[in-house]
Amino acid sequence: MASSSNYNTYMQYLNPPPYADHGANQLIPADQLSNQQGITPNYVGDLNLDDQFKGNVCHAFTLEAIIDISAYNERTVKGVPAWLPLGIMSNFEYPLAHTVAALLTGSYTITQFTHNGQKFVRVNRLGTGIPAHPLRMLREGNQAFIQNMVIPRNFSTNQFTYNLTNLVLSVQKLPDDAWRPSKDKLIGNTMHPAVSVHPNLPPIVLPTVKKQAYRQHKNPNNGPLLAISGILHQLRVEKVPEKTSLFRISLPADMFSVKEGMMKKRGENSPVVYFQAPENFPLNGFNNRQVVLAYANPTLSAV
């Protein structure tokens, strides 16, 4: 069912519970988070600094961590992988080289906390925050992930102690067929239809449904939310081969508009939306998911 686009509906995605405890731009000292020393990441990925001068280029940023997990009365499990998606960003939003430099020069720790019975893994960046940066990690200094979505599920539900032993920053260039809102949409105040897949994951922003599609529904006055809700059953998720934590949705070409996006026009090809999610994100459809309105740039504030 589609939700309203009021302030409270959108603000739950700007400030979900895992982040609200510390507030924006407040970096927490290491001694308040963990006894361990921070670790500096290595780098892998599709980094071509010439791309930072091309406005229509987007990159996905992921931290790939190796952690040791210790629990009370259980032996330590070493070498557990974790995939921690940081977000997708275009050069319209922030220079690529500056983002990579800030991520690589930061020192990181990892901790666990529980909120309303849900267990989270929090990655903490120890360094100076960048208040207007599109990536939450650089904007706020910490980012929380649902535990059972970022580490293997075959561990008990007891309280764990995490020891971060290795960290890699993965920068992945999105393919040329990627749809992203255009520059004026990113820096303006236009909201887009989006699919919510979990209360603590950001909604997946979609292109606007073509006006012709509105007329196929009983009440076209409800606009893009109703139009998207009526065709969720047609959307399918695919894992992008050889990419970490990157997924895509191919949209029906006859129902979605790509005019406002950065996609290169290739005949009648369908627009493709890329998004980040944990590696074990379910590849089923979006039917019965909640539809909301959201900004493409999470640094914008609802008014």
Swiss-Prot record:
Cross-referenced InterPro entries: EV_matrix, EV_matrix_protein_N, EV_matrix_sf
Major localization listed first in the record, in broad terms: virion
GO CC annotations, alphabetized: host cell endomembrane system; host cell late endosome membrane; host cell plasma membrane; membrane; virion membrane
Motif PPXY motif, residue numbers: 16-19
Keywords linked to the UniProt accession: Host cell membrane, Host endosome, Host membrane, Host-virus interaction, Inhibition of host innate immune response by virus, Inhibition of host interferon signaling pathway by virus, Inhibition of host JAK1 by virus, Interferon antiviral system evasion, Membrane, Viral budding, Viral budding via the host ESCRT complexes, Viral immunoevasion, Viral matrix protein, Viral release from host cell, Virion
Membrane topology recorded in Swiss-Prot or TrEMBL: Peripheral membrane protein
Homology family: Belongs to the filoviridae matrix protein VP40 family.
Any further remark recorded for this protein: Most abundant protein in the virion.
Subunit comment: Exists as a dimer until it reorganizes at the plasma membrane into multimeric form. Interacts with host TSG101. Interacts (via PPXY motif) with SMURF2 (via WW domains); the interaction positively regulates virus budding.
Free-text note regarding domains: Late-budding domains (L domains) are short sequence motifs essential for viral particle budding. They recruit proteins of the host ESCRT machinery (Endosomal Sorting Complex Required for Transport) or ESCRT-associated proteins. VP40 contains one L domain: a PPXY motif which potentially interacts with the WW domain 3 of NEDD4 E3 ubiquitin ligase and the three WW domains of SMURF2 E3 ubiquitin ligase.
Protein name: Matrix protein VP40
Organism, scientific name: Lake Victoria marburgvirus (strain Angola/2005)
Taxonomic lineage: Viruses, Riboviria, Orthornavirae, Negarnaviricota, Haploviricotina
